[in-house]
């Protein structure tokens, strides 16, 4: 099995921002973007969203919603698409776990 080192190629932006999306019934739902990254192997940009106001004592209980961010012709904005392959789910889980662990350790030293 080969060892993958994503850190040298993975572009990560963890600047938080609020986004309004619509659920299946057309209701507005406010999400906080907790992580955004481009993965060179899949050549896609991903965003990890958490429903705003979905607070919990245990961070693991907050449901994270990964989406593919497909830019428009101008390379801006675009639309969110669902993640469909198991390979992408596994990669996203690995990136999120690594980033969240790093984020937790950063706060331990403040």
Swiss-Prot record:
InterPro entries reported in the protein's UniProt record? UPF0473
Q: Which HAMAP family match?
A: UPF0473
- PANTHER family of this UniProt entry? UPF0473 PROTEIN CBO2561/CLC_2432, UPF0473 PROTEIN CBO2561_CLC_2432
Q: Which family does it belong to?
A: Belongs to the UPF0473 family.
| UniProt protein name | UPF0473 protein SSP1146
Origin species, per record, is: Staphylococcus saprophyticus subsp. saprophyticus (strain ATCC 15305 / DSM 20229 / NCIMB 8711 / NCTC 7292 / S-41)
